[in-house]
Structures are given as structure tokens and as C-alpha cells.
Amino acid sequence: VSGEVPGTDGGPMTSSEGGVRGRALTLAGVLAAAETAAPVESLDVVARILREHLGAVSVSFLITDFTGGSVVRLGAAGSVDTGEPARRITLRDTLYDDVIRTQQPRVEETGEDRRVRVVAPVTNRGDAIGLLELFLPAAPDAQVMREIGESAHALAYIVIANRSFTDVYQWGRRTKPLSLAAEIQHRLLPASLACEAAQFAVAGALEPADHVGGDTFDYTIDRDTVQL
């Protein structure tokens, strides 16, 4: 369900109405801010920027799990309990599922204090890493949606860069305990299970993700060929 909820002047909310006045959010700006923080705190930096700039009531990042059928909401730095499986949110027939499948952001009325919910895909070259979810005081205008899209794109790069330095993202993807064979097999898979370009698209997955029997796949891209 999409809806137009008025801003302060009866129209859609602009970024200047939502929070801190100033320049529009850009991919480069969000990346630069995240790089000043420790790898486990980069998500918190992006969330704080969005809260301050857009006046968002809440901002969260949801990462896709190994099964591809669920997402996991990652909290503030240090809140991931590695001793227990992460709490999974099943995707089927949800707004999250729609956003991941269509790779288009969605705006939904919540019915609470005229707030709206915005969910944007966090994707890099077809690799669906997760989702950016915000609750805003009013419906966003086109500029705000562009800024949210830029921030979601920045999050994809942030996760890709920082998952080499911390296990927070890996633990978030483990909604089921992995067998030893599955742990080893996942380490041998491509870092990104999908790649989309103008000339081709390739994607793969292991099923079941938590227990494998030796199957694997890989791909590499040369200037003129894709090798599988």
C-alpha cells in the first residue's frame, strides 16, 4: 500500500522539513562518513545520518540470511548475540519480499501519527544484500527518495567492504546452525552469489544452505567471457 501523507505544508515531506537543513545526502558523503567509524559501527553512522537529515523516527538494516527466504534485523553495534541464532523474519508475502524481488523502494502508510514506512533494497550489481527500513514523519518527496536510494546503495558498499573485518554480518545471516561441511563450503563460494551487468546476469545458491553434500559453484568474469 502506497500513500501520500502530507508534510508540514500539506504536501510530501522534503529533506529540509524532515531534519537537519543542508546539502542533499550523496553516495560519496555517506561512504565518507562511514569510513570514519570502526567496521562494526558503520551501520550506526549511516542510521544516525538518516535520522538527523530526514528526521526519521527509526532506521534499521535487514540482512538476507543464507537461505534467501528470510531477513535479519541488525541492531546497534555490539547487540548481535553470537551465541544464539539470529531472529529471522520470513520474507514470503511481505513488503520486504516485494522490495527484494522488484528491487524497487516501497512507501507504506502505517496509520500511526501519520508516519510512513519506507523500505529500500540494499543491492550491489544484482546481489541482494539486504534492506534499508525507515519510519518517517511524513511521505517523502522525490528528492528524499533519491537520498534514501543513495544511502541504501552506500550501505551495500559498506557491508561488502566491512565484512572482511568483522563477523557481525556473517552471524546475522546464520538463522540456522550450519554443519561443519556447510561452513567450509560457504567459505569456498564466490563473495557475491549474483552479478548483474549490461551484457549478462549470473546467480547461484546452495540448497539447503545449512547442510550441504559437496555441491558448489563459482564464476569469474574476463573482458570477453563469463566462466562458470
Describe the residue ranges of each PLM region.
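Short beta-strand-to-loop transition segments that serve as allosteric relay/switch motifs
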Residues: 130-140
